[in-house]
Amino acid sequence: MNFTGYSRFLIVFVALVGALVLPSKAQDSPQDYLRVHNQARGAVGVGPMQWDERVAAYARSYAEQLRGNCRLIHSGGPYGENLAWGSGDLSGVSAVNMWVSEKANYNYAANTCNGVCGHYTQVVWRKSVRLGCAKVRCNNGGTIISCNYDPRGNYVNEKPY
């Protein structure tokens, strides 16, 4: 195949645009959210979650309400909820990994946190079996990730698993 200068430029341009655009989308699919949640759950012997479009629709609707100010304010809705914020393009996988990193603060034997661990305990909450997540780019360029859990978890004095 013989490429002209313009053809070579076009091929390189398309490849670069694809390399810049695809990674941000590649870690925001329902399968991506489920994979990282279920890895964390499996590590402590908790069964997998299933994607639930009804729960995801709730997450999308609420995340859209946060687009204007990008503040991490919980919805107070019917589901368990984890929120994450990034100043740029935060992926869903990165958000879930931040929540899972709180495992280091959780003492299962005492069922206590040494620091923040409530996001982690919601991720691994045994009775939460349906998941829905959403990502919204805020007006200020930041990103909000919202994951909702059905049924909700994090009940006082109850271990997650």
Curated annotation (Swiss-Prot):
Subcellular location: Secreted, Extracellular space, Apoplast
Keywords carried by this UniProt record: Apoplast, Disulfide bond, Pathogenesis-related protein, Plant defense, Secreted, Signal
UniProt record, GO biological process: defense response; response to vitamin B1; response to water deprivation; systemic acquired resistance
Keyword Signal: yes
GO cellular component annotations of the record: apoplast; secretory vesicle
SS bond list: C70-C138, C113-C117, C133-C147
Superkingdom: Eukaryota
Induction of synthesis: By 2,6-dichloroisonicotinic acid (INA) and salicylic acid (possibly an endogenous signal for acquired resistance). Strongly induced by pathogen infection.
Residues of the signal peptide: 1-26
Domain (SCP): residue spans on this chain: 34-149
Function: Partially responsible for acquired pathogen resistance.
Entry similarity comment: Belongs to the CRISP family.
Protein's recorded name: Pathogenesis-related protein 1
Originating organism: Arabidopsis thaliana
Organism ancestry: Eukaryota, Viridiplantae, Streptophyta, Embryophyta, Tracheophyta
